[in-house]
């Protein structure tokens, strides 16, 4: 296995485990085991758990970029917003099981630290993209609309996870998509 392959596997394992259990409940040993990499190799690539967390944040930022690039291929902002909501509905199983991976990171990084600022930028990227869609629709209060929609999505994810019922999330995303 190449060094870049080991690093990639460690990041992917951390992404999965942070989503499933959270940052604080996941040890570096857990990550090494999931990645099938010796524990000592973790320290070769990441000097601290914070360094690994930053790599996870960068991976999540890349995922957000990929999502918004794909959504931007739709012709109108209304279509893009609907497709965003249908994307969430399509992934209802994972959100119901683990919650929103970005939301979970933000909740864990709730203290004023450099890491909390870094993870907040992930939601900031989503919020900025949503705001741009509402602005293109001509909404005078595009920021407020974006905050409202993101809050509705996060609330629906939380309820689906709480009640272990993905149909709640799917139904709410479909309702919101029809309202756009």
Mark where each language-model region is.
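Helix-turn-helix
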Residues: 9, 13-51, 55
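Hydrophobic alpha-helical segments that form the core
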Residues: 104-107, 141-162, 175-178
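A secondary-structure capping/hinge motif
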Residues: 50-52, 105, 114
């Amino acid at each position: 296995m190449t060094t870049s392959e080991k690093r990639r596997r460690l990041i992917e394992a951390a992404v999965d485990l942070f989503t499933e259990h959270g940052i604080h409940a996941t040890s570096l040993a857990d990550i090494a085991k999931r990645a099938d990499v010796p524990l000592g190799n973790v320290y070769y690539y990441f000097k601290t758990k914070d360094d690994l967390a930053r790599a996870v944040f960068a991976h999540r930022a890349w995922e957000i970029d990929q999502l918004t690039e794909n959504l931007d291929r739709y012709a109108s902002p209304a279509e893009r917003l609907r497709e965003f909501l249908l994307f969430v509905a399509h992934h209802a199983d994972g959100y119901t099981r683990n919650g929103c991976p970005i939301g979970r990171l933000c909740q864990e990084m709730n203290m004023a630290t450099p890491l909390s600022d870094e993870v907040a930028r992930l939601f900031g990227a989503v919020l900025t993209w949503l705001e741009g869609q509402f602005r293109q629709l001509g909404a005078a209060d595009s920021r407020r609309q974006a905050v409202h929609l993101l809050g509705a999505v996060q609330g629906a994810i939380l309820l689906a996870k709480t009640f272990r019922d993905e149909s709640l999330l799917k139904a709410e995303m479909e309702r919101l998509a029809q309202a756009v």
